[in-house]
């Protein structure tokens, strides 16, 4: 039976255990994800408390991280989502995304509405991909693809 959390606390505590085990075992999220059949972005979000994992995927990651049966079951529960309590994020990496939305949010909204009509881009029917590419001017660039299904507003 599908279970749902009513508080972020259990999944936050599990996320701490997961990061500690990942560090202790010197694993990458990609290595932990291998064999789950899921994208590394989805599995990472689940391990950090933002998604439930299917039972098979939970078994795979629990084995790699030496998590007990209770932790494995908890990974399968529907979490209370949202990882930025208290408003504006203070972590520099997360803040840059907040800044991107502050600068480009109205532009994204205008262009989405112009191209698709009144509606939203789903964060549920959604895919995320991150790639590291060489910058022709030196260094590296992060190519981040946000791929969400468009959902039109339906009058009622």
From Swiss-Prot:
SMART domains hit by this protein: Cyanate_lyase
Catalytic residues (positions): 96, 99, 122
Catalyzed reactions per annotation: cyanate + hydrogencarbonate + 3 H(+) = NH4(+) + 2 CO2
EC number: 4.2.1.104
GO annotation (BP), single: cyanate metabolic process
Keywords on record: Lyase
InterPro entries assigned to the protein according to its UniProt record, in alphabetical order: Cyanase, Cyanate_lyase_C, Cyanate_lyase_C_sf, CYNS_N, Lambda_DNA-bd_dom_sf
UniProt keyword Transport, yes or no: no
Pfam families to which the protein is assigned, alphabetical: Cyanate_lyase, CYNS_N
Disulfide bonds: none
Molecular function per GO: cyanate hydratase activity; DNA binding
Similarity comment text for this entry: Belongs to the cyanase family.
Primary role: Catalyzes the reaction of cyanate with bicarbonate to produce ammonia and carbon dioxide.
NCBIfam families named among the record's database cross-references: cynS, PRK02866.1
The protein's name: Cyanate hydratase
Gene: cynS
């Amino acid at each position: 039976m599908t279970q749902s959390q009513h508080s972020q606390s259990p999944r936050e505590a599990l996320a701490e255990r997961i990061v500690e085990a990942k560090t202790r075992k010197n694993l990458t999220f990609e290595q932990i994800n291998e064999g789950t059949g899921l994208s590394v972005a989805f599995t990472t979000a689940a391990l950090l408390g933002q998604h439930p994992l299917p039972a098979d995927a939970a078994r795979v990651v629990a084995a790699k991280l030496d998590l007990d049966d209770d932790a494995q079951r908890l990974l399968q529960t529907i979490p209370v989502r949202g990882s930025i309590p208290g408003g504006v994020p203070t972590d520099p990496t997360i803040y840059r995304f907040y800044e991107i939305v502050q600068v480009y949010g109205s532009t994204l909204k205008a262009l989405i509405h112009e191209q698709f009509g009144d509606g939203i881009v789903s964060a549920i029917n959604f895919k995320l991909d991150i790639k590291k590419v060489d910058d022709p001017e030196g260094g590296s660039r992060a190519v981040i693809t946000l791929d969400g299904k468009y959902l039109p507003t339906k009058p009622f």
